[in-house]
Protein backbone atom coordinates (compact mmCIF):
# COMPACT_ATOMS: atom_id res chain seq x y z
CA UNK A 1 0.00 0.00 0.00
CA UNK A 2 1.31 3.44 -0.97
CA UNK A 3 1.00 5.77 2.02
CA UNK A 4 3.24 8.58 0.76
CA UNK A 5 2.13 12.22 0.86
CA UNK A 6 2.98 12.69 -2.81
CA UNK A 7 2.27 9.48 -4.70
CA UNK A 8 3.02 10.68 -8.20
CA UNK A 9 2.94 13.44 -10.78
CA UNK A 10 1.31 13.61 -14.20
CA UNK A 11 2.46 15.94 -16.96
CA UNK A 12 0.33 18.06 -19.29
CA UNK A 13 2.80 19.24 -21.92
CA UNK A 14 0.11 21.15 -23.80
CA UNK A 15 0.39 23.77 -21.05
CA UNK A 16 4.02 24.45 -22.01
CA UNK A 17 4.87 26.71 -24.94
CA UNK A 18 6.46 24.87 -27.86
CA UNK A 19 9.41 27.27 -27.75
CA UNK A 20 10.11 26.61 -24.08
CA UNK A 21 13.49 25.14 -23.18
CA UNK A 22 11.60 22.50 -21.22
CA UNK A 23 10.62 20.82 -24.46
CA UNK A 24 14.29 20.50 -25.39
CA UNK A 25 15.19 18.53 -22.26
CA UNK A 26 15.57 14.95 -23.50
CA UNK A 27 14.53 13.30 -20.25
CA UNK A 28 11.14 15.01 -20.40
CA UNK A 29 10.31 13.86 -23.92
CA UNK A 30 7.40 11.44 -23.77
CA UNK A 31 7.10 11.29 -19.98
CA UNK A 32 3.47 11.38 -18.89
CA UNK A 33 3.51 10.10 -15.31
CA UNK A 34 5.90 9.23 -12.50
CA UNK A 35 5.00 7.17 -9.45
CA UNK A 36 6.52 7.66 -6.01
CA UNK A 37 6.11 4.56 -3.87
CA UNK A 38 9.00 4.84 -1.41
CA UNK A 39 9.68 7.19 1.52
CA UNK A 40 12.91 8.31 -0.19
CA UNK A 41 13.09 9.13 -3.90
CA UNK A 42 16.31 10.27 -5.56
CA UNK A 43 16.69 12.16 -8.83
CA UNK A 44 20.08 11.59 -10.47
CA UNK A 45 21.63 12.51 -13.79
CA UNK A 46 24.06 14.76 -15.59
CA UNK A 47 24.00 18.53 -15.13
CA UNK A 48 21.19 20.03 -17.17
CA UNK A 49 19.23 16.77 -17.37
CA UNK A 50 16.13 18.27 -15.72
CA UNK A 51 16.26 16.71 -12.26
CA UNK A 52 16.44 19.99 -10.29
CA UNK A 53 13.83 21.51 -12.60
CA UNK A 54 11.39 18.72 -11.75
CA UNK A 55 12.16 18.91 -8.03
CA UNK A 56 11.50 22.65 -8.07
CA UNK A 57 8.25 22.15 -10.00
CA UNK A 58 7.00 19.61 -7.45
CA UNK A 59 7.92 21.96 -4.60
CA UNK A 60 6.21 25.00 -6.13
CA UNK A 61 3.13 23.03 -7.21
CA UNK A 62 2.83 21.78 -3.63
CA UNK A 63 2.96 25.28 -2.20
CA UNK A 64 6.62 25.84 -1.28
CA UNK A 65 8.55 29.03 -1.98
CA UNK A 66 10.62 28.57 -5.19
CA UNK A 67 13.77 29.70 -3.38
CA UNK A 68 13.30 27.32 -0.47
CA UNK A 69 12.08 27.20 3.09
CA UNK A 70 8.71 26.20 4.47
CA UNK A 71 5.33 26.96 2.92
CA UNK A 72 5.26 30.07 5.12
CA UNK A 73 8.33 31.60 3.44
CA UNK A 74 7.10 34.27 1.02
CA UNK A 75 10.30 36.15 0.15
CA UNK A 76 11.66 36.45 -3.38
CA UNK A 77 15.12 37.66 -4.39
CA UNK A 78 15.13 36.44 -7.99
CA UNK A 79 12.20 34.98 -9.94
CA UNK A 80 13.83 32.19 -11.92
CA UNK A 81 11.64 29.13 -11.45
CA UNK A 82 10.36 27.43 -14.59
CA UNK A 83 6.78 27.09 -15.79
CA UNK A 84 6.93 23.31 -15.33
CA UNK A 85 5.02 23.72 -12.06
CA UNK A 86 2.00 24.78 -14.15
CA UNK A 87 2.17 21.62 -16.25
CA UNK A 88 2.23 18.98 -13.53
CA UNK A 89 -0.54 17.63 -11.36
CA UNK A 90 0.39 16.11 -8.03
CA UNK A 91 -1.33 12.92 -6.91
CA UNK A 92 -1.70 13.19 -3.13
CA UNK A 93 -2.18 10.34 -0.69
CA UNK A 94 -4.62 10.08 2.16
CA UNK A 95 -2.06 11.40 4.66
CA UNK A 96 -1.14 15.08 4.99
CA UNK A 97 2.32 16.09 6.09
CA UNK A 98 2.68 17.83 9.45
CA UNK A 99 5.70 19.84 8.33
CA UNK A 100 7.70 20.43 5.20
CA UNK A 101 10.85 22.05 3.88
CA UNK A 102 12.38 22.79 0.49
CA UNK A 103 16.16 23.07 0.79
CA UNK A 104 18.30 24.29 -2.10
CA UNK A 105 22.07 24.56 -1.92
CA UNK A 106 22.12 27.48 -4.36
CA UNK A 107 19.78 29.69 -2.33
CA UNK A 108 20.78 28.58 1.15
CA UNK A 109 22.20 31.99 2.12
CA UNK A 110 18.90 33.71 1.33
CA UNK A 111 16.88 31.11 3.24
CA UNK A 112 19.18 31.38 6.27
CA UNK A 113 18.79 35.17 6.19
CA UNK A 114 15.03 34.85 5.99
CA UNK A 115 15.02 32.44 8.93
CA UNK A 116 16.66 35.13 11.05
CA UNK A 117 14.09 37.71 9.97
CA UNK A 118 11.20 35.38 10.84
CA UNK A 119 12.62 34.58 14.28
CA UNK A 120 10.84 35.76 17.40
CA UNK A 121 10.85 35.04 21.15
CA UNK A 122 8.89 31.82 20.73
CA UNK A 123 10.96 30.74 17.73
CA UNK A 124 14.50 32.05 18.22
CA UNK A 125 16.92 32.10 15.31
CA UNK A 126 19.43 29.29 14.97
CA UNK A 127 21.92 31.94 13.77
CA UNK A 128 23.06 29.94 10.76
CA UNK A 129 25.24 32.80 9.50
CA UNK A 130 27.42 32.46 12.60
CA UNK A 131 28.39 28.90 11.65
CA UNK A 132 30.53 27.58 8.82
CA UNK A 133 28.72 26.90 5.56
CA UNK A 134 28.74 23.14 6.08
CA UNK A 135 27.78 23.36 9.75
CA UNK A 136 24.92 25.76 9.09
CA UNK A 137 23.59 23.76 6.14
CA UNK A 138 23.55 20.54 8.14
CA UNK A 139 22.05 22.30 11.17
CA UNK A 140 19.25 23.79 9.08
CA UNK A 141 18.45 20.40 7.61
CA UNK A 142 18.52 18.66 10.99
CA UNK A 143 16.49 21.39 12.72
CA UNK A 144 13.69 20.95 10.21
CA UNK A 145 13.58 17.14 10.02
CA UNK A 146 10.53 15.76 11.79
CA UNK A 147 8.50 12.54 11.57
CA UNK A 148 5.60 12.73 9.12
CA UNK A 149 7.22 15.62 7.26
CA UNK A 150 7.74 16.26 3.54
CA UNK A 151 11.23 17.28 2.44
CA UNK A 152 12.67 18.29 -0.91
CA UNK A 153 16.46 18.65 -0.97
CA UNK A 154 18.41 19.91 -3.98
CA UNK A 155 22.05 18.75 -3.85
CA UNK A 156 22.36 18.84 -0.04
CA UNK A 157 25.85 17.33 -0.29
CA UNK A 158 27.23 20.53 -1.85
CA UNK A 159 28.22 22.00 1.53
CA UNK A 160 28.92 18.78 3.40
CA UNK A 161 32.06 16.75 4.01
CA UNK A 162 31.77 12.98 3.50
CA UNK A 163 31.43 12.53 7.27
CA UNK A 164 28.63 15.09 7.45
CA UNK A 165 26.94 13.38 4.52
CA UNK A 166 26.87 10.19 6.56
CA UNK A 167 25.33 12.13 9.44
CA UNK A 168 22.62 13.45 7.12
CA UNK A 169 22.07 9.96 5.70
CA UNK A 170 21.34 8.64 9.19
CA UNK A 171 18.91 11.49 9.90
CA UNK A 172 17.06 10.99 6.62
CA UNK A 173 16.82 7.23 7.09
CA UNK A 174 15.49 7.50 10.64
CA UNK A 175 13.01 10.21 9.72
CA UNK A 176 11.75 8.20 6.73
CA UNK A 177 11.17 5.25 9.04
CA UNK A 178 8.95 7.53 11.13
CA UNK A 179 6.63 8.50 8.29
CA UNK A 180 8.50 11.27 6.48
CA UNK A 181 8.88 11.49 2.70
CA UNK A 182 11.95 12.80 0.88
CA UNK A 183 12.71 13.89 -2.67
CA UNK A 184 16.43 14.42 -3.14
CA UNK A 185 18.49 15.58 -6.11
CA UNK A 186 22.06 14.43 -5.57
CA UNK A 187 25.37 13.42 -7.10
CA UNK A 188 26.54 11.90 -3.82
CA UNK A 189 27.23 8.14 -3.86
CA UNK A 190 27.02 8.30 -0.06
CA UNK A 191 23.49 9.69 0.14
CA UNK A 192 22.37 7.45 -2.72
CA UNK A 193 23.24 4.49 -0.51
CA UNK A 194 20.20 5.03 1.74
CA UNK A 195 18.44 1.63 1.89
CA UNK A 196 15.05 1.01 0.29
CA UNK A 197 15.02 4.16 -1.83
CA UNK A 198 13.82 4.64 -5.40
CA UNK A 199 16.34 6.19 -7.77
CA UNK A 200 15.06 7.94 -10.90
CA UNK A 201 17.78 8.50 -13.50
CA UNK A 202 17.37 11.38 -15.97
CA UNK A 203 20.05 10.25 -18.43
CA UNK A 204 19.82 8.54 -21.83
CA UNK A 205 16.75 10.45 -22.97
CA UNK A 206 14.23 9.30 -20.38
CA UNK A 207 13.33 9.28 -16.71
CA UNK A 208 13.65 5.72 -15.47
CA UNK A 209 14.22 3.76 -12.30
CA UNK A 210 17.69 2.36 -11.77
CA UNK A 211 19.71 0.50 -9.16
CA UNK A 212 22.30 2.13 -6.93
CA UNK A 213 25.16 0.37 -8.70
CA UNK A 214 23.88 1.63 -12.06
CA UNK A 215 24.20 5.31 -11.15
CA UNK A 216 27.05 7.27 -12.66
CA UNK A 217 27.90 8.66 -9.21
CA UNK A 218 28.60 5.17 -7.93
CA UNK A 219 30.33 3.88 -11.06
CA UNK A 220 32.70 6.81 -11.52
CA UNK A 221 33.58 6.93 -7.81
CA UNK A 222 34.23 3.19 -7.67
CA UNK A 223 36.29 3.33 -10.85
CA UNK A 224 38.44 6.15 -9.56
CA UNK A 225 39.03 4.62 -6.12
CA UNK A 226 39.91 1.20 -7.50
CA UNK A 227 41.93 2.41 -10.50
CA UNK A 228 43.17 5.82 -9.49
CA UNK A 229 46.67 5.70 -10.92
CA UNK A 230 45.63 4.08 -14.19
CA UNK A 231 42.87 6.64 -14.72
CA UNK A 232 45.12 9.57 -13.90
CA UNK A 233 47.78 8.28 -16.26
CA UNK A 234 45.21 8.21 -19.07
CA UNK A 235 43.44 11.45 -18.23
CA UNK A 236 46.54 13.55 -17.61
CA UNK A 237 48.70 12.29 -20.43
CA UNK A 238 50.17 15.15 -22.43
Q: Which residues does each predicted region cover?
A:
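The conserved Walker
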Residues: 46-47
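ABC ATPase nucleotide-binding domain signature region
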Residues: 42, 53-117
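C-terminal lobe/lid and adjacent interdomain/linker elements of RecA-like ASCE P-loop ATPase modules
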Residues: 163-181, 188-238
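N-terminal pre-Walker A segment at the start of P-loop NTPase domains
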Residues: 1-32, 37
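GG-anchored amphipathic helix commonly corresponding to the ABC/SMC/Rad50 NBD signature/C-loop
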Residues: 131-155, 163-175
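Conserved glycine(s) of the Walker
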Residues: 50
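Conserved D-loop beta-strand region of ABC ATPase nucleotide-binding domains
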Residues: 154, 184-185
Amino acid sequence: MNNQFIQGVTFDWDRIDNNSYLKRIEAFLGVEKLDFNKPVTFFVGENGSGKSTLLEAIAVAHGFNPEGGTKNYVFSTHDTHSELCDAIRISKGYRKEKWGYFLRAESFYNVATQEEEYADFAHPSAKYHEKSHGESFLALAQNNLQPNGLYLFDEPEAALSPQRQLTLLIQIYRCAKEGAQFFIVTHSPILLGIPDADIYCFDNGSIHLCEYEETESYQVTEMFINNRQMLLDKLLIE
